[in-house]
């Protein structure tokens, strides 16, 4: 019987180690939130050093620790590596390769966490659904969340953040999403880029950096949509779905009625399907997120009865 998460034998295989079997329940970088059975990665950063917390990790019930220097005073199983962050990335990439999970990667200048959290809420009754935690979307958090995803997960939803060009590419090489979603291109990160076009190019890494992708979902009304579409045409991605508030997309708003407190929407989906829902007047900004979610569920062939 396979373990619920990555197993010690699989870790031994990847890192040429010889540790005896122990139950692994996920992974952590922080002893304050570490759970019993978690792998502890002693990350050495500019302002803190995880190696100082090996004893705390042992007391909290960590299963094993990845370290750059062995703590001989601890009885915790330890694997010495050259760089613990690289080890985290390598282990997450390896574990991902063992899974049959459909992975959905979400990026955009705004709305990533809200969209992912809404998906989590809608599918809360579903078993075998995993959504990465809020803001765990960088080189530390995303691979950590892959290791926290149970082996039997059917659909995994992850957000990918960036501040510089090339960051999403590195995350995609680990995550290998089956479906990639770009919510929007805005000037949120303009401080590190010269133009919105540069942001669009950097965001496009979510679908140009992997051959695993079956489907791409784009907001047809976002900045530089034509650029993103042109990049899509140069890939081997089988399916593209777009959404907008207008009727020139795969998923669009067919009817819109506004009352004092609610915006009632009737949305058209491929196959002549219609779905109705409402959002509060003060949450009109969530409409694009809702359209993205509906498009994603269609691409996954998930029944819209769950909405």
Q: Model regions: which residues?
A:
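Acidic, Mg2+-coordinating active-site environments of NTP-dependent enzymes
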Residues: 67-75, 181-305
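General small-molecule cofactor/ligand-binding pocket signal
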Residues: 79, 130, 241
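Short, well-ordered turn and helix-capping elements at secondary-structure junctions
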Residues: 28-31, 44, 91, 110, ...
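N-terminal leader/targeting and accessory segments in enzymes
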Residues: 1-90, 282, 288, 302-303
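Phosphate-binding loop of NTP-binding sites
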Residues: 9-12, 86-220, 224-236, 291-294
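Alpha-helix C-terminal capping segments
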Residues: 60, 173-175, 298-301
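Short beta->alpha junction loops/turns
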Residues: 46, 81-84, 135, 161, ...
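Glycine-rich, charged/polar anion/phosphate-binding loops
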Residues: 25-27, 165-168, 251-253
């Amino acid at each position: 019987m396979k373990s619920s998460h990555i197993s010690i034998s699989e870790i031994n295989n990847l890192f040429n180690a010889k540790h005896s079997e122990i139950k692994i329940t996920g992974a952590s970088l922080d002893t304050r939130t570490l759970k019993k059975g978690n792998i502890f990665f002693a990350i050495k950063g500019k302002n803190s050093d995880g190696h100082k917390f090996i004893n705390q990790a042992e007391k909290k019930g960590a299963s094993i620790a990845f370290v750059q220097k062995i703590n001989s005073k601890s009885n915790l199983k330890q694997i010495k590596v050259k760089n613990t962050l690289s080890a985290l990335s390598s282990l997450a990439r390896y574990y991902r390769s063992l899974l049959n999970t459909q992975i959905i990667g979400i990026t955009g200048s705004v709305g990533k966490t809200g969209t992912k959290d809404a998906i989590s809420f809608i599918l809360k009754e579903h078993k075998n659904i995993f959504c990465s935690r809020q803001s765990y979307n960088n080189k530390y958090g995303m691979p950590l969340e892959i290791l926290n995803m149970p082996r039997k997960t059917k659909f995994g939803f992850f957000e990918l953040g960036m501040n510089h060009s090339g960051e999403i590419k590195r995350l995609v090489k680990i995550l290998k999403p089956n479906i990639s979603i770009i919510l929007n291109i805005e000037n949120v990160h303009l401080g590190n880029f010269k133009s919105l076009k540069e942001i669009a190019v950097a965001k496009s890494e979510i679908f140009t950096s992997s051959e695993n992708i079956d489907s791409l979902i784009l907001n047809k009304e976002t900045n530089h949509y034509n650029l993103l579409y042109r990049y899509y045409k140069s890939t081997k991605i089988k399916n593209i779905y777009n959404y907008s508030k207008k009727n020139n997309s795969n998923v669009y708003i067919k009817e819109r009625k506004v009352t004092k407190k609610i915006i009632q929407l009737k949305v058209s989906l491929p196959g002549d399907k219609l779905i109705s829902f409402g959002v509060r007047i003060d949450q009109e900004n969530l409409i694009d997120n809702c359209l993205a979610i509906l498009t994603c569920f269609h691409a996954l062939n998930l029944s819209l009865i769950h909405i």
